[in-house]
């Protein structure tokens, strides 16, 4: 089969994988297409952790796969987890050729699946539309290779770079369309991270309000001194709400745990939570993608540590004045050479606002 045909069928597999965009955590999003004589005869995708993987779901849709080609967006697994190995299912079904978009970064798999298929007599090809497939699973890849999640921070600002009035009033700088777009960012995320200042000021729910099936993100508060109120709205929601702290106050911890919070003590650095330790802890919790929704203090600290992989900034066509609050609280930079630089990735309209997508120039995406 030609490279053009391989790319065509892999593109379809990638579209199928997107069906799991909001539901597969902590697993990767994977799609599979089975082809015989240049015709798609079976399709499937991974829906949810613990349920069938994409290859198995595709095989379920047909009675005979002998001699066919399977296009899979991620290397088929070769180990026993919550489900049996997908490699075995493909081999038993009589698949003759397996085309994979990318090798699995999971060290339990990482090349072993391709090797097993090869040894069983399957023709194997890897790297077809790899970049597009990787983009679907940035968080999973980050957790497996960097031992921390892919971190995205959402910011909303005026034309003059202000996030709130001097009083702290911020509802609403951006439009209803921009705020609705944020809900999709939440739905795509494994966790939403905020700081105690935002909790005390806004008391947010930090849930994803979308009209599709979604695994609700884990809510995470960075709270150095355990100041989170027991009345915080997010404690009333289903799912996990975590408070990460440096405090060893067992009384405060017990009070928060009694209303539904999980409280974890982490290392500190210069009197505050060690943000690198936070990211490693979140990876240990099987969190792939983190969305930061916080104020200038936490965003400034994350920027200073180069811990944000992607910045999503909604800019409204309004001006709040020079007394308004800024995007980042950071130590004063002494010279132009110390400036923080970014790389543009996308600019588009969302209603009357602009949605700007950038990464820190010092971080490889």
Give residue spans per PLM region.
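Residue-level signal for inorganic ion chemistry
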Residues: 13, 31, 77, 117, ...
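Short gly/pro/ser/thr-enriched loop/turn and capping motifs at secondary-structure boundaries
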Residues: 105-108, 131-132, 200, 227-229, ...
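Active-site ligand-binding patch in enzyme domains
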Residues: 142, 148, 152-159, 163-288, ...
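Short, basic/aromatic recognition patches
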Residues: 5-25, 143
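Flexible, gly/pro- and Lys/Arg-enriched active-site loops
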Residues: 304-342
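Zn2+-dependent cytidine deaminase-like catalytic core
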Residues: 34-132, 218, 249, 303
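Conserved histidine-centered catalytic loops in small-molecule metabolism enzymes
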Residues: 331-365
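Short beta-strand scaffold segments in enzyme catalytic cores
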Residues: 29-38, 155-156, 356
């Amino acid at each position: 089969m030609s490279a053009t045909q391989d790319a065509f069928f892999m593109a379809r597999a990638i579209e199928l994988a997107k069906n799991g965009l909001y539901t597969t955590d902590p697993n990767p999003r994977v799609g599979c297409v089975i082809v015989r004589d240049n015709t798609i005869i079976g399709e499937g995708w991974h829906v949810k952790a613990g349920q069938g993987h994409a290859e198995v779901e595709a095989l379920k849709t047909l009675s005979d796969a002998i001699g066919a080609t399977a296009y899979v967006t991620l290397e088929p697994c070769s180990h026993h987890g919550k489900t049996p190995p997908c490699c075995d299912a493909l081999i038993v079904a009589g698949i003759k050729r397996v085309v994979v978009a990318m090798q699995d970064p999971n060290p339990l798999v990482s090349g072993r699946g391709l090797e097993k298929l090869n040894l069983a007599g399957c023709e194997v090809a890897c790297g077809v539309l790899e970049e597009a497939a990787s983009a679907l699973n940035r968080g999973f890849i980050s957790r497996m290779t960097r031992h921390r999640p892919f971190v995205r921070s959402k910011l909303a600002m005026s034309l003059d770079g202000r996030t709130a009035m001097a009083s702290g009033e911020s509802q609403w700088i951006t439009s209803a369309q921009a705020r609705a777009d944020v809900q999709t960012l939440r739905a795509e995320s494994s966790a939403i991270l905020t700081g105690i200042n935002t909790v005390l000021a806004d008391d947010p729910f930090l849930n994803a309000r979308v009209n599709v099936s979604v695994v609700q993100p884990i809510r995470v508060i960075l709270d150095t001194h355990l100041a989170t109120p027991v009345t915080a709205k997010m404690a009333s929601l289903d799912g996990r709400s975590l408070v990460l702290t440096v405090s060893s106050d067992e009384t405060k911890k017990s009070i928060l745990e009694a209303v539904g919070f999980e409280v974890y003590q982490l290392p500190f650095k210069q009197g505050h939570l060690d943000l690198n330790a936070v990211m490693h802890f979140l990876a240990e919790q099987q969190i792939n993608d983190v969305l930061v929704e916080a104020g200038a203090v936490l965003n400034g600290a994350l920027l200073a540590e180069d811990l944000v992989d992607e910045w999503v900034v909604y800019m409204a066509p309004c001006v709040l004045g020079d007394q308004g609050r800024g995007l980042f609280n950071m130590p004063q930079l002494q010279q132009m050479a110390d400036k923080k630089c970014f790389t543009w990735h996308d600019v588009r309209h969302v209603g009357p606002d602009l949605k700007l997508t950038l990464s820190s120039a010092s971080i490889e995406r």
